[in-house]
């Protein structure tokens, strides 16, 4: 079964989607997962992903993965689900539910190559783990500096940074 998984949005959403891909692959190891995204590097080297395409180069997928084959496609928007908006469920729980799989606390996967590890480990010599926090995002063409449904309030960001600053770089 071919699963065409479309992930529209920013790099943060793409990274989060890898947790859902892991959940899908765990429950459906027979699926070949083909990702269409604006951020292909997020999925590179991920063993759960069979193939990666951008929205600019996916025209030939029809004959490769759809025509005369079993397939399903997910082009889902978990941010717009009422359970996420109201805080009843996490984004991961909502997304897994939309994909008809159980969410079992899977975490995002971002797999670096040995060359990348060698190159960047020289730049980040530290005795503490690195903490990355993406507080705001979105499409730069939307002209939205802040979006209540997407971005963390600045005072919350400050609290998070102050809480973790001694333990992380």
Regions found by a protein language model. Give the residues of each.
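Catalytic machinery of carbohydrate-active enzymes
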Residues: 1-169
């Amino acid at each position: 079964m071919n699963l065409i998984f479309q992930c529209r949005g920013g790099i943060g959403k793409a990274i989060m989607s890898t947790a859902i891909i892991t959940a899908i692959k765990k429950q459906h190891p027979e699926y070949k997962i083909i990702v269409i995204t604006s951020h292909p590097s997020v999925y590179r080297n991920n063993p759960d992903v069979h193939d990666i395409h951008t929205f600019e180069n996916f025209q030939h997928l029809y004959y490769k993965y759809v025509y005369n084959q079993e397939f399903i496609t997910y082009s889902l928007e978990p941010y717009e689900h009422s359970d996420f908006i109201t805080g009843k469920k996490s984004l991961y729980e909502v997304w897994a539910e939309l994909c008809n799989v159980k969410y079992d606390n899977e975490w995002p996967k971002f797999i670096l190559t040995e060359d990348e590890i060698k190159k960047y480990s020289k730049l980040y010599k530290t005795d503490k783990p690195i903490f990355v926090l993406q507080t705001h995002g979105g499409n730069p063409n939307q002209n939205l500096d802040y979006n209540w449904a997407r971005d963390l309030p600045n005072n919350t960001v400050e609290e998070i940074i102050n809480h973790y600053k001694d333990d992380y770089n």
